[in-house]
């Protein structure tokens, strides 16, 4: 049966446009949806969200510093920001839970007593081989210069949540939760000229 002549005609400009849009829509429909930064692997009625949260890094630098310059094994690293986390996880009855606990994902200060301003940030990394974990960085922020890494703490873990606060002496406190005793205090050792973790009082 011969094909009708109308079907053999070369599509005009409008027809080509429609075909092009249709192809783009089909490609978009077939493309996988972008993964959310936070996914929950559990029941919120039974566990706190930061316990069951898994974070999926999607950036390749932190404050302009390539991830693989922070650690050679890293391919991705994304610092935590409130705008990346669903509001319903961070707020309870309209109250910012982190703010109420004096916690933050980034804190500025002069943590080693030097003149340049510094910023501490926490986030999630992913190694090129696949494993993920959480990190804490302290970066120098010289006026008019590029940030420079002063301290790195990174741990492979399936529970990547982390937050920061300051103790009454102005020392940085790293939290692995929002309502628990899981924290570590970072201090500047003047004699050794380096940062280090204070001993856990429960282990002494």
PLM regions with names:
Residues 113-123, 168-175:
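Acidic/hydrophobic-patterned starts of short beta strands in beta-sheet-rich repeat architectures
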């Amino acid at each position: 049966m011969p094909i009708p002549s109308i079907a053999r005609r070369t599509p005009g400009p409008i027809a080509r446009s429609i075909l092009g849009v249709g192809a783009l829509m089909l490609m978009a429909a077939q493309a996988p949806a972008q993964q959310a930064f936070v996914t929950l692997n559990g029941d919120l009625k039974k566990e706190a969200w930061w316990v069951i949260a898994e974070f999926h890094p999607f950036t390749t630098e932190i404050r302009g510093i390539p991830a693989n310059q922070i650690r050679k094994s890293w391919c991705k690293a994304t610092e935590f920001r409130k705008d990346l986390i669903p509001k319903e996880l961070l707020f309870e009855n309209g109250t910012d839970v982190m703010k109420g606990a004096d916690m933050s994902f980034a804190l500025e200060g002069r943590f080693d007593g030097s003149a340049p301003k510094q910023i501490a940030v926490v986030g999630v990394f992913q190694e090129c081989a696949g494993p993920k974990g959480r990190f804490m960085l302290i970066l120098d922020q010289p006026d008019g210069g590029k940030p420079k890494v002063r301290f790195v703490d990174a741990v492979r873990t399936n529970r990547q949540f982390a937050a920061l606060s300051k103790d009454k002496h102005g020392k940085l406190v790293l939290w692995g939760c929002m309502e628990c005793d899981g924290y570590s205090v970072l201090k500047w050792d003047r004699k050794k000229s380096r940062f280090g973790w204070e001993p856990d009082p429960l282990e002494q």
